[in-house]
């Protein structure tokens, strides 16, 4: 079971830390009410442009969100991806998927930019129009 909580972050890292703690407490309270055995908890967080997301699960999980900004999409994708694109949305979808996958693997992004993703990726809903996000598990 996985859950995610999305909050606008208008203050600073202290607030983001509070969001992580709140998400973990909410997730744990659900399990402590229903189970008496210890539960292994996995969590992942991401923030961009004043927004933060936290994902909690009983299995490995990775999450990433990115605010879409103007960049040299074709040059970056040619250098780092197997797929070449000059489209902003396609670029950010690929980047976000690879970041979420990297967090799931607990690895470095440089090792996974050209990797084929063999895990389930789900797009996050409810984000602002200029923000894209994925959860990997």
Per-range role (PLM):
Residues 1-137:
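Core catalytic alpha/beta fold that binds nucleotide/phospho-ligands
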């Amino acid at each position: 079971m996985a859950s995610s909580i999305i909050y606008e972050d208008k203050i600073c890292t202290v607030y983001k830390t509070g969001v992580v703690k709140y998400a973990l407490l909410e997730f744990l309270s659900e399990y402590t009410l229903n189970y008496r055995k210890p539960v292994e908890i996995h969590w992942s967080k991401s923030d961009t442009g004043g927004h933060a997301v936290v994902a909690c699960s009983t299995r490995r999980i990775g999450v990433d969100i990115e605010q879409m900004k103007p960049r040299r999409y074709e040059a970056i994708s040619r250098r780092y991806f197997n797929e070449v694109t000059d489209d902003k949305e396609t670029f950010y979808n690929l980047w976000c998927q690879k970041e979420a996958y990297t967090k799931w693997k607990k690895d470095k992004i440089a090792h996974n930019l050209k990797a084929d993703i063999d895990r389930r990726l789900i797009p996050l809903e409810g984000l602002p129009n200029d923000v894209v996000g994925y959860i990997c598990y």
